Amino acid sequence: MKPSQKQTQRQPHFSKDSAKKRDFSAKNDRRSVSRTARIETANTKKSAVNSDNKFLSKPKAKPVVRASNQPKAEGEKLQKVLARAGQGSRREIETMIAAGRVSVEGKIATLGDRIDVHSGVKVRIDGQIINLSHTQKEICRVLMYYKPEGELCTRSDPEGRATVFDRLPRLTGSRWIAVGRLDINTSGLLLFTTDGELANRLMHPSREVEREYSVRVFGQVDDAMLARLRKGVQLEDGLANFKEIKFTGGVGINQWYDVTLMEGRNREVRRLWESQGIQVSRLIRIRYGNIKLMKGLPRGGWEEMDLENVNYLRELVGLPAETETKLDVKQASRRPKSGQIRKAVKRYSEMNKRYKK
């Protein structure tokens, strides 16, 4: 039998494995196409929604305005003006402001307030109006005072004990500001000034103004102990040390030393020695910067410093020189002798005792 003219073409034979591979590759192609399409569609919708709804787009960052571009507050800091007016050091006045004792135009002042002294603004401390008219022309005055033991470095004492301000000359329109403090059992040089800014700078640790003390200690002192005190000892308020220690005399376990500090922390000299088991039995401040306790000045006596020494202190802390003084040159040349000062101090002490009785 002859084969028919039309012969069916033979279909190629595929194995099951090859079919699976073919189907898998096709499926992957479809998936890749569909994934690309979905991403393009999503992006199109997102851009369309964002163009219609502005709240979905992230706001642009505002340009940073630097402090230098902002207008500065007019006037000077309140504590600086009041310090120059002789109402205390800047730190003392900052404490007053924080306690709500200072008001400006009837409103309680806050730290950072500024005032213009030429605007006639009314400033009160504890309800009393402060005269600011003389703050620009106040002459810087400095007193050297020999503080005796038993006096407090405060303006008033509720127990009625003597204070270092009791014997100072009276002032009108300003007041004396103590440059630092000495505890009740410490005697020696204490400076007072009418310039609050000068007092603040002289006291600030960053100025590193030297304070020298003559100290009598009770106990056995050795070289290792002195080396530790020079290097530094950890106290409860931080590391402290003596810049210089010089032996000046003594017998046995009672010895005298001159020690120098670069700051004035509370009872720092005593605490440094006590950290080594040594007791301080006598402490006298003999120098502040280059200002030495004047020989012949009795305990409880004071001496106003001349313009040269005032300007030394001002230059020491970066303040402009003073050009005026209230110290009478002729009167200064006729200064009373130490014996006269001692008699005056003794009379004052006797009168004070009778008054308290």
Swiss-Prot record:
CDD domains recorded: PseudoU_synth_RluB (cd02556), S4 (cd00165)
Region listing for Disordered, in residue ranges: 1-76
PROSITE patterns assigned to the protein according to its UniProt record, in alphabetical order: PSI_RSU (PS01149), S4 (PS50889)
Keyword RNA-binding: yes
GO biological process, one term: enzyme-directed rRNA pseudouridine synthesis
A Pfam family that the UniProt record links to this protein: PseudoU_synth_2
Reactions the enzyme catalyzes: uridine(2605) in 23S rRNA = pseudouridine(2605) in 23S rRNA
Feature: compositional bias, Polar residues: 1-12, 41-54
Molecular function terms from GO: 23S rRNA pseudouridine(2605) synthase activity; RNA binding
Catalytic residues (positions): D183
Domain S4 RNA-binding: 76-148
Domain of life: Bacteria
Top EC class of this enzyme: isomerase
Listed Basic and acidic residues bias regions: 14-32
Keyword field: Isomerase, RNA-binding, rRNA processing
Intrachain disulfide bonds: none
UniProt-listed Enzyme Commission number(s): 5.4.99.22
NCBIfam families, A to Z: PRK10700.1, pseudouridine synthase
Biological role: Responsible for synthesis of pseudouridine from uracil-2605 in 23S ribosomal RNA.
Record family assignment: Belongs to the pseudouridine synthase RsuA family.
Descriptive protein name: Ribosomal large subunit pseudouridine synthase B
